[in-house]
A protein has these predicted regions:
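Walker A/P-loop nucleotide-binding motif
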Residues: 97-113
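Interdomain "pre-motor" coupling segment immediately N-terminal to P-loop NTPase/helicase cores
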Residues: 11-65
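Non-DNA-binding regulatory cores of transcription-related proteins
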Residues: 91-92, 190
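Conserved post-Walker A coupling segment in P-loop NTPases
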Residues: 97-101, 117-140
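Conserved phosphate/pyrophosphate-binding and hydrolysis machinery centered on Walker-type P-loop NTPases
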Residues: 3, 27-32, 44, 62-63, ...
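N-terminal pre-Walker A segment at the start of P-loop NTPase domains
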Residues: 67-89
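Conserved hydrophobic/aromatic pocket- or pore-lining residues that grip, position, or stack substrates
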Residues: 72, 114, 132
Length: 253
């Protein structure tokens, strides 16, 4: 094999945990046609593994619906000063463990954007967990009663990005608030969280039934976070079948 072929084969073999010694032995007797066949075999195996990994990450994310960002209208999404759209779509906030708060009334596309960013993260090989917040609190409470809370927290902690959808839509009792706080505090400076909410920061104390707990959460989010405001008309209303509008539109949150 020539040097270029050697390097390519070694690289592919390394990704599949095939030893250099095995490739060296193969190189000693293989014909060019055999080398080409092995290249194609390894390419196929690598592609299959990438697809399997992508599918596994997608299942673990538990998105309610799969949505990309092709055609997403950012006209009514107000970014923080100095924060560019390319930075958001480049997912630079994830390796920096920065949080994003998507704030706006219902139907402005907050959940769609959160899922779209989560899909991009999966395409990059990153782990994502999507949770409707009130449902998550119920699941955490059940896990605590069943003695499986640590297992659940470890699973969530494996993610690079956590999406807490409809944050604050339903108030929590103090026990639920403390369980949710474990996830938020445990993610601080370790992984990113996207919150979608229609509740302004000043009212988060009513959601958590504890002003001090709410203040501690806000402090962590603000320290390494950015606020994106969603304005304009409800996308659901503008695309509603009831009014004879766009019949191909997907529901938005």
């Amino acid at each position: 094999m020539n040097t270029k072929t050697d390097e390519g084969l070694y690289e592919k073999a390394h990704k599949l945990f095939i030893s250099k010694a095995s490739i060296d032995e193969f190189a000693g007797w293989a014909t060019p046609r055999q080398v080409d066949a092995v290249h194609r075999l390894l390419d196929t195996e690598l592609a299959n593994r990438e697809r399997a990994k992508h599918d596994r990450l997608l299942r673990r994310a538990r998105f309610p619906v799969v949505k990309g960002l092709d055609g997403y209208d950012f006209t009514n999404v107000r970014l923080p000063d100095g924060y560019m759209l390319d930075e958001l779509l480049g997912l630079g906030f994830i390796p920096r463990a920065q949080d994003l708060v998507f704030y706006g009334k219902t139907g402005r596309g907050k959940t769609h954007l959160a899922i779209g960013l989560g899909m991009k993260a999966i395409d990059m090989g990153l782990g994502v967990r999507f949770h409707q917040t009130a449902e998550l609190v119920l699941q955490l409470g059940k896990a605590k009663r069943d003695g499986t809370l640590e297992t659940m927290l470890r699973d969530i902690g494996r993610a690079d990005l956590i999406i807490l959808d409809e944050f604050g839509y339903v108030p929590f009792d103090i026990d639920g608030a403390r369980l949710l706080y474990q996830i938020i505090a445990g993610s601080y400076e370790r992984r990113s969280i996207i919150f979608t909410t229609n509740i302004e920061f000043s009212k988060w104390g009513t959601v958590f039934a504890d002003d001090k707990l709410a203040a501690a959460i806000i402090d962590r989010i603000v320290h390494h976070g950015r606020l994106l405001e969603f304005t304009g008309q409800s996308r659901r209303v503008s695309e509603a079948l009831m009014f004879g509008r766009n019949t191909s539109a997907q529901p938005e949150k």
